[in-house]
Amino acid sequence: MEFLGDSQNHDSSETEKKNKKKKRFHRHTPHQIQRLESTFNECQHPDEKQRNQLSRELGLAPRQIKFWFQNRRTQKKAQHERADNCALKEENDKIRCENIAIREAIKHAICPSCGDSPVNEDSYFDEQKLRIENAQLRDELERVSSIAAKFLGRPISHLPPLLNPMHVSPLELFHTGPSLDFDLLPGSCSSMSVPSLPSQPNLVLSEMDKSLMTNIAVTAMEELLRLLQTNEPLWIKTDGCRDVLNLENYENMFTRSSTSGGKKNNLGMEASRSSGVVFTNAITLVDMLMNSVKLTELFPSIVASSKTLAVISSGLRGNHGDALHLMIEELQVLSPLVTTREFCVLRYCQQIEHGTWAIVNVSYEFPQFISQSRSYRFPSGCLIQDMSNGYSKVTWVEHGEFEEQEPIHEMFKDIVHKGLAFGAERWIATLQRMCERFTNLLEPATSSLDLGGVIPSPEGKRSIMRLAHRMVSNFCLSVGTSNNTRSTVVSGLDEFGIRVTSHKSRHEPNGMVLCAATSFWLPISPQNVFNFLKDERTRPQWDVLSNGNSVQEVAHITNGSNPGNCISVLRGFNASSSQNNMLILQESCIDSSSAALVIYTPVDLPALNIAMSGQDTSYIPILPSGFAISPDGSSKGGGSLITVGFQIMVSGLQPAKLNMESMETVNNLINTTVHQIKTTLNCPSTA
């Protein structure tokens, strides 16, 4: 009996221990929940003092208050994500329906001029789509393991092998299609553009790819923030003000395996940092930099083309926080003598604190992308700090490695090797100028310098500015060496350094547009060259087409704080009766780095009246010509590099039948213009 009693006592003690081990749950009262919700709506992150006050008021432990707010924030984030997903799904369905309707309309469209059906290009794009989709079947074991070893310092093994990749040329992945019309940037449709691939990213990525990309992006962001926040000895001053990376200190701070498989003699490294204040709020700036179409419109002189291949993470709604995109970009210098640089990058945005964002770009080895320029982008990007007065402070870092497959032209060696061609200073200077331009675009009143009230309304002013921006974008594509335009190189660099390309005209079914460009050096400062070329009073001294007749400015729109940044409508005097209806639209601009543009196009009077009345200008035909001016980068200083480009229409000829007469015409036009500029400025002909 005693044994049995001992057994019962033992069982009861075990039961008590089990009861003690059970978790005790506490359900808050409706009053407590109501008070907590009220506080949460006012402040989602209460400090310790507020939590202690709530603890005393509601009779809860501070730890319970802390956990309640953590759980409530997680719950609200999940609700927002579900709402975002539903909204995106609805928008995707709407776009899909619109796409189907447009395709059906195109199938049954009839040309009003000839009555024939348009050429069906669906088969071409279907083929490209199939090639891109088939390229997803690749050997993930080797690729992912090598990338992980390079960026994360450890390989990833035991992955299921897939099919070998099918390489797709960058030409098939890029597109430079019509621009979109959005809040700040004007809609445009370049005459050099072609039917674009779908703007919505349609690349399917595995979860393993997404996880790897996220790890690489987070690591790159950490490196970028250290580069932004660290000064000497990591960064050293050159030329008194420019920040250049000390590569030895950098390699000691950041260790990684080589990207090029060993040191090569023709391998170059560029790393620079610059900062400035821009006239745009931080949220708007982040939105522009995270959108590939807006980015191309914002930097037409730098970004030749850009496309988002995949959205790994869309980020928080409204501010792009934690957004991660896989993108392809091609960067250019406005000259036929400098090859472009192509990158496949991960672009990651992170909100560092309230009013501060960081955006990082880092190269990613993607099988479908084969860079012809063999360029590599180390963690680069910018830090954007909102200044609460409509301005933002931007600090930019550019860090890249490139292989010179062909020697850089002697004329451009200094600006390329010193980082002036692709460096941070150029990005900041261009960003400041373009933000001023787009702010002026939104100004409700026309400029006080508008001569004679020719532009009658704010809508007319904005329409003219959009047309001018399309003109600038078209010119930048025509003089560069982008691989992603549908242009054909008719004649490479001849003995005068002139390159001629051709493409089909959007506005003339049987017409071809010839684009000729060359670069030359002048021993004169960029500011003086800019003042000479933009002044309508000196225009007859170099403009072959003006035939020496004087030119008058009939309308003027200011484009920024620099008085030289403006859009002008010019009219020639003593012109023949057939030219009375022809005017010239010109945009001139110069930034803090002394890089300048003077671009113009002839526009007939009826078309200009359409623009001045505020109507759509996307169908007005333009053939931009003009000049791109930059410092020569020489230590002696004072010289300028000028790229001149002309476009002419050739009717009734196919690309293979372009005759020598057309080639001679455009070559003579450039040679005569360059000769007259040098003669007027008292420069030797060999300069």
Swiss-Prot record:
Main location: nucleus
InterPro entries tied to this protein: GLABRA2/ANL2/PDF2/ATML1-like, HD, Homeobox_CS, Homeodomain-like_sf, START-like_dom_sf, START_lipid-bd_dom
Record key words, sorted: Coiled coil, DNA-binding, Homeobox, Nucleus, Transcription, Transcription regulation
Pfam families reported for this sequence: Homeodomain, START
Gene Ontology biological process terms from the UniProt entry: cell differentiation; maintenance of floral organ identity; trichome branching
Disruption phenotype: No visible phenotype under normal growth conditions, but the double mutants hdg11 and hdg12 exhibit excess branching of trichomes. The double mutant pdf2-1 hdg12-2 exhibits abnormal flowers with sepaloid petals and carpelloid stamens in association with a reduced expression of APETALA 3 (AP3) in the epidermis and internal cell layers of developing flowers.
Compositionally biased tracts (Basic and acidic residues): 8-17
Subcellular location: Nucleus
Domain of life per record: Eukaryota
Tissue expression notes: Expressed in apical meristems and young epidermal tissue including trichomes and stipules. Expressed in lateral root tips, the L1 layer of apical inflorescence meristems and early flower primordia, carpel and stamen filament epidermis, stigma papillae, ovule primordia, nucellus and embryo.
Known function: Probable transcription factor that acts as a negative regulator of trichome branching in association with HDG11. Seems to promote cell differentiation. May regulate cell differentiation and proliferation during root and shoot meristem development. Acts as a positive regulator of SCL18/LAS expression. Involved, together with PDF2, in the regulation of flower organs development by promoting the expression of APETALA 3 (AP3) in the epidermis and internal cell layers of developing flowers.
UniProt-listed PANTHER family: HOMEOBOX-LEUCINE ZIPPER PROTEIN HDG12, HOMEOBOX-LEUCINE ZIPPER PROTEIN MERISTEM L1
Family that this chain belongs to: Belongs to the HD-ZIP homeobox family. Class IV subfamily.
Protein's name in the database: Homeobox-leucine zipper protein HDG12
Organism: Arabidopsis thaliana (Mouse-ear cress)
